[in-house]
Regions:
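Conserved alpha-helix/loop element of class I SAM-dependent methyltransferases that forms part
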Residues: 1-20, 30-34
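Class I SAM-dependent methyltransferase SAM/SAH-binding core
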Residues: 23-69
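Short conserved loop adjoining the S-adenosyl-L-methionine
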Residues: 69-74, 90
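A conserved beta-strand element that flanks and buttresses the S-adenosyl-L-methionine
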Residues: 81
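A short glycine-rich, Lys/Arg-flanked "PGG" loop and its adjoining helix->strand segment in the class I
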Residues: 93-107
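Conserved class I S-adenosyl-L-methionine
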Residues: 105-139
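Short alpha-helix
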Residues: 146, 150-180
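A C-terminal cap/extension of S-adenosyl-L-methionine-dependent methyltransferases
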Residues: 173-257
Length: 257
Protein backbone atom coordinates (compact mmCIF):
# COMPACT_ATOMS: atom_id res chain seq x y z
CA UNK A 1 0.00 0.00 0.00
CA UNK A 2 1.15 3.56 -0.68
CA UNK A 3 0.84 6.49 1.75
CA UNK A 4 -2.69 7.37 0.69
CA UNK A 5 -3.92 3.79 1.04
CA UNK A 6 -2.35 3.48 4.50
CA UNK A 7 -4.16 6.65 5.52
CA UNK A 8 -7.37 5.26 4.03
CA UNK A 9 -6.96 2.06 6.04
CA UNK A 10 -6.32 4.04 9.21
CA UNK A 11 -9.50 6.10 8.72
CA UNK A 12 -11.68 3.05 8.07
CA UNK A 13 -10.33 1.11 11.05
CA UNK A 14 -10.71 4.14 13.32
CA UNK A 15 -14.25 5.12 12.40
CA UNK A 16 -16.19 2.16 10.99
CA UNK A 17 -17.02 -0.97 12.97
CA UNK A 18 -15.99 -4.21 11.31
CA UNK A 19 -19.53 -5.64 11.18
CA UNK A 20 -20.97 -2.57 9.42
CA UNK A 21 -22.81 -2.80 6.13
CA UNK A 22 -20.66 -0.69 3.81
CA UNK A 23 -21.13 0.74 0.32
CA UNK A 24 -18.08 1.99 -1.56
CA UNK A 25 -18.81 4.34 -4.46
CA UNK A 26 -16.44 4.83 -7.40
CA UNK A 27 -14.45 1.98 -5.91
CA UNK A 28 -11.67 -0.21 -7.17
CA UNK A 29 -8.78 -2.44 -6.20
CA UNK A 30 -7.48 -0.10 -3.48
CA UNK A 31 -10.85 -0.18 -1.72
CA UNK A 32 -10.97 -3.96 -2.02
CA UNK A 33 -7.50 -4.35 -0.49
CA UNK A 34 -8.23 -1.98 2.40
CA UNK A 35 -11.50 -3.60 3.47
CA UNK A 36 -10.20 -7.12 2.93
CA UNK A 37 -7.09 -6.41 5.01
CA UNK A 38 -9.36 -5.22 7.85
CA UNK A 39 -11.52 -8.39 7.66
CA UNK A 40 -14.75 -6.64 6.70
CA UNK A 41 -17.36 -9.01 5.29
CA UNK A 42 -20.43 -6.94 4.33
CA UNK A 43 -19.07 -4.63 1.64
CA UNK A 44 -20.50 -3.63 -1.74
CA UNK A 45 -18.09 -1.96 -4.17
CA UNK A 46 -19.53 0.07 -7.05
CA UNK A 47 -18.17 1.80 -10.13
CA UNK A 48 -19.13 2.74 -13.69
CA UNK A 49 -15.98 1.33 -15.29
CA UNK A 50 -17.12 -1.26 -17.89
CA UNK A 51 -13.79 -3.08 -17.67
CA UNK A 52 -14.28 -4.25 -14.09
CA UNK A 53 -14.80 -7.97 -13.50
CA UNK A 54 -17.00 -8.46 -10.44
CA UNK A 55 -15.22 -11.74 -9.64
CA UNK A 56 -12.07 -9.74 -8.85
CA UNK A 57 -13.81 -8.39 -5.75
CA UNK A 58 -14.85 -11.69 -4.19
CA UNK A 59 -15.94 -12.19 -1.41
CA UNK A 60 -17.37 -8.68 -1.60
CA UNK A 61 -20.27 -7.74 -3.82
CA UNK A 62 -19.73 -5.60 -6.92
CA UNK A 63 -22.42 -3.50 -8.64
CA UNK A 64 -22.49 -1.10 -11.57
CA UNK A 65 -23.57 2.20 -9.98
CA UNK A 66 -23.12 5.89 -10.79
CA UNK A 67 -22.01 7.74 -7.63
CA UNK A 68 -24.10 10.75 -8.66
CA UNK A 69 -27.27 8.71 -9.23
CA UNK A 70 -27.35 5.72 -6.89
CA UNK A 71 -30.33 3.40 -7.30
CA UNK A 72 -30.42 2.35 -3.64
CA UNK A 73 -33.17 3.38 -1.24
CA UNK A 74 -32.56 5.87 1.55
CA UNK A 75 -30.60 4.50 4.52
CA UNK A 76 -29.70 1.26 2.72
CA UNK A 77 -26.21 0.98 4.24
CA UNK A 78 -24.63 1.76 7.59
CA UNK A 79 -21.79 3.71 6.00
CA UNK A 80 -20.99 4.89 2.49
CA UNK A 81 -17.34 5.41 1.60
CA UNK A 82 -15.41 7.08 -1.20
CA UNK A 83 -11.66 7.19 -1.65
CA UNK A 84 -9.97 9.66 -4.02
CA UNK A 85 -12.85 9.62 -6.48
CA UNK A 86 -15.22 12.55 -5.87
CA UNK A 87 -12.97 14.73 -8.02
CA UNK A 88 -13.67 12.40 -10.95
CA UNK A 89 -17.39 13.23 -10.77
CA UNK A 90 -18.87 15.98 -12.93
CA UNK A 91 -20.75 17.08 -9.80
CA UNK A 92 -18.80 16.14 -6.66
CA UNK A 93 -21.42 17.74 -4.42
CA UNK A 94 -24.18 15.62 -5.98
CA UNK A 95 -22.14 12.47 -5.34
CA UNK A 96 -21.56 13.56 -1.74
CA UNK A 97 -25.28 14.07 -1.11
CA UNK A 98 -26.12 10.74 -2.78
CA UNK A 99 -23.70 9.05 -0.40
CA UNK A 100 -25.42 10.79 2.49
CA UNK A 101 -28.87 9.78 1.26
CA UNK A 102 -28.22 6.04 1.14
CA UNK A 103 -26.25 5.95 4.42
CA UNK A 104 -28.06 5.31 7.69
CA UNK A 105 -25.24 6.19 10.08
CA UNK A 106 -22.77 8.27 8.11
CA UNK A 107 -20.28 8.74 5.30
CA UNK A 108 -16.50 8.56 5.08
CA UNK A 109 -14.64 10.57 2.44
CA UNK A 110 -10.92 10.57 1.67
CA UNK A 111 -10.00 13.41 -0.67
CA UNK A 112 -7.47 16.15 -1.36
CA UNK A 113 -7.74 19.25 0.80
CA UNK A 114 -7.75 22.72 -0.76
CA UNK A 115 -5.02 24.00 1.54
CA UNK A 116 -2.78 27.03 1.18
CA UNK A 117 0.20 24.74 0.52
CA UNK A 118 -1.64 22.92 -2.28
CA UNK A 119 -2.64 26.21 -3.90
CA UNK A 120 0.97 27.35 -3.74
CA UNK A 121 2.23 24.10 -5.29
CA UNK A 122 -0.31 24.44 -8.09
CA UNK A 123 0.85 27.99 -8.83
CA UNK A 124 4.47 26.86 -8.84
CA UNK A 125 3.61 24.08 -11.27
CA UNK A 126 4.49 21.20 -8.93
CA UNK A 127 0.90 19.96 -8.66
CA UNK A 128 -1.67 19.82 -11.45
CA UNK A 129 -5.29 20.97 -11.60
CA UNK A 130 -6.23 18.51 -14.37
CA UNK A 131 -5.46 14.79 -14.21
CA UNK A 132 -3.95 14.11 -17.59
CA UNK A 133 -1.74 11.32 -16.25
CA UNK A 134 -4.73 9.29 -15.04
CA UNK A 135 -6.16 9.27 -18.57
CA UNK A 136 -2.77 8.45 -20.10
CA UNK A 137 -2.36 5.51 -17.71
CA UNK A 138 -5.75 4.19 -18.88
CA UNK A 139 -4.77 4.09 -22.57
CA UNK A 140 -6.35 7.51 -23.16
CA UNK A 141 -9.80 5.92 -22.96
CA UNK A 142 -10.78 6.10 -19.28
CA UNK A 143 -9.77 7.70 -16.00
CA UNK A 144 -11.11 11.21 -16.55
CA UNK A 145 -14.34 12.93 -15.60
CA UNK A 146 -17.05 10.30 -15.08
CA UNK A 147 -14.37 7.76 -16.10
CA UNK A 148 -14.25 9.18 -19.64
CA UNK A 149 -11.28 10.13 -21.81
CA UNK A 150 -11.70 13.80 -20.84
CA UNK A 151 -9.23 14.69 -18.05
CA UNK A 152 -11.04 15.78 -14.92
CA UNK A 153 -10.46 18.92 -12.90
CA UNK A 154 -9.05 18.02 -9.48
CA UNK A 155 -11.73 19.33 -7.13
CA UNK A 156 -10.21 19.84 -3.68
CA UNK A 157 -12.30 20.31 -0.55
CA UNK A 158 -12.26 22.25 2.70
CA UNK A 159 -13.97 21.41 5.98
CA UNK A 160 -16.29 24.38 5.63
CA UNK A 161 -17.40 23.34 2.16
CA UNK A 162 -18.22 19.80 3.29
CA UNK A 163 -20.25 21.09 6.22
CA UNK A 164 -22.13 23.64 4.11
CA UNK A 165 -22.98 21.01 1.50
CA UNK A 166 -24.33 18.52 4.04
CA UNK A 167 -26.23 21.07 6.12
CA UNK A 168 -27.79 22.56 2.98
CA UNK A 169 -28.87 19.16 1.71
CA UNK A 170 -30.36 18.06 5.04
CA UNK A 171 -31.08 21.12 7.25
CA UNK A 172 -33.15 19.37 9.91
CA UNK A 173 -30.62 18.14 12.44
CA UNK A 174 -27.21 18.66 14.02
CA UNK A 175 -24.57 16.67 12.15
CA UNK A 176 -21.24 15.65 13.59
CA UNK A 177 -18.10 16.20 11.52
CA UNK A 178 -14.69 14.65 12.23
CA UNK A 179 -11.40 15.04 10.34
CA UNK A 180 -7.97 13.46 10.09
CA UNK A 181 -5.06 14.82 8.06
CA UNK A 182 -2.09 13.38 6.20
CA UNK A 183 0.37 14.06 3.43
CA UNK A 184 0.72 11.62 0.56
CA UNK A 185 3.03 13.66 -1.65
CA UNK A 186 6.44 12.19 -2.40
CA UNK A 187 8.25 15.17 -3.87
CA UNK A 188 11.05 12.92 -5.10
CA UNK A 189 8.60 11.46 -7.60
CA UNK A 190 7.47 14.80 -9.01
CA UNK A 191 8.21 15.39 -12.67
CA UNK A 192 10.52 18.35 -12.05
CA UNK A 193 14.17 19.20 -12.59
CA UNK A 194 16.95 18.01 -10.29
CA UNK A 195 17.54 21.59 -9.15
CA UNK A 196 13.92 21.94 -8.07
CA UNK A 197 14.12 18.60 -6.25
CA UNK A 198 17.17 19.85 -4.35
CA UNK A 199 15.33 23.04 -3.41
CA UNK A 200 12.31 21.05 -2.29
CA UNK A 201 14.52 18.78 -0.21
CA UNK A 202 15.66 21.72 1.91
CA UNK A 203 12.10 22.93 2.26
CA UNK A 204 11.00 19.54 3.63
CA UNK A 205 12.29 20.34 7.11
CA UNK A 206 10.43 23.64 7.13
CA UNK A 207 7.33 21.97 5.76
CA UNK A 208 7.33 19.26 8.43
CA UNK A 209 7.63 21.87 11.17
CA UNK A 210 4.86 23.90 9.54
CA UNK A 211 2.37 21.03 9.37
CA UNK A 212 3.20 20.05 12.95
CA UNK A 213 1.68 23.35 14.05
CA UNK A 214 -0.84 23.58 11.19
CA UNK A 215 -1.89 19.99 10.36
CA UNK A 216 -4.80 21.15 8.23
CA UNK A 217 -2.31 22.44 5.66
CA UNK A 218 -1.52 18.90 4.55
CA UNK A 219 -2.81 17.88 1.15
CA UNK A 220 -4.96 14.95 2.24
CA UNK A 221 -7.79 14.55 4.71
CA UNK A 222 -10.47 12.11 5.71
CA UNK A 223 -13.95 13.31 6.53
CA UNK A 224 -16.44 11.47 8.70
CA UNK A 225 -19.99 12.79 8.69
CA UNK A 226 -22.36 11.24 11.23
CA UNK A 227 -26.06 11.69 10.59
CA UNK A 228 -28.09 13.12 13.48
CA UNK A 229 -30.25 11.06 15.79
CA UNK A 230 -33.41 13.05 15.12
CA UNK A 231 -34.99 11.93 18.38
CA UNK A 232 -32.26 13.92 20.15
CA UNK A 233 -30.60 16.17 17.57
CA UNK A 234 -33.51 17.73 15.69
CA UNK A 235 -33.16 21.50 15.38
CA UNK A 236 -35.23 23.22 18.12
CA UNK A 237 -37.41 25.04 15.56
CA UNK A 238 -38.65 21.72 14.19
CA UNK A 239 -40.86 18.97 15.61
CA UNK A 240 -42.29 15.57 14.76
CA UNK A 241 -45.97 15.70 13.86
CA UNK A 242 -47.98 12.74 12.54
CA UNK A 243 -44.84 10.93 11.43
CA UNK A 244 -43.25 13.86 9.60
CA UNK A 245 -41.01 16.77 10.49
CA UNK A 246 -42.77 20.12 10.68
CA UNK A 247 -42.00 23.65 11.70
CA UNK A 248 -42.49 24.43 15.38
CA UNK A 249 -44.32 27.74 14.95
CA UNK A 250 -44.26 28.51 18.67
CA UNK A 251 -40.47 28.64 18.53
CA UNK A 252 -40.54 31.39 15.89
CA UNK A 253 -43.31 33.29 17.62
CA UNK A 254 -41.34 33.31 20.86
CA UNK A 255 -38.15 34.35 19.08
CA UNK A 256 -39.47 37.13 16.84
CA UNK A 257 -42.57 38.60 18.45
Amino acid sequence: MDRREHFYRKAVSHWIEINAKVLVVAGGSADYLVFKSLDFTNVTITNIDPRINKNDYYPFSYKFQDAENLTYENDSFDFVVVHAALHHCSSPHKALTEMYRVAEKGILVIESRDSFIMKLLVKLGYVVNYELRAVFDNKCLYGGVNDSEIPNFVYRWTENEVEKTINTFMPIGMHQFFYMYANDKDFNKLNISKLHKIILYFFKVIYRAFIFFFPRQQNLFSILVLKPDLSKQLHPWLKFYNGSIRLKKTYLVKKFE
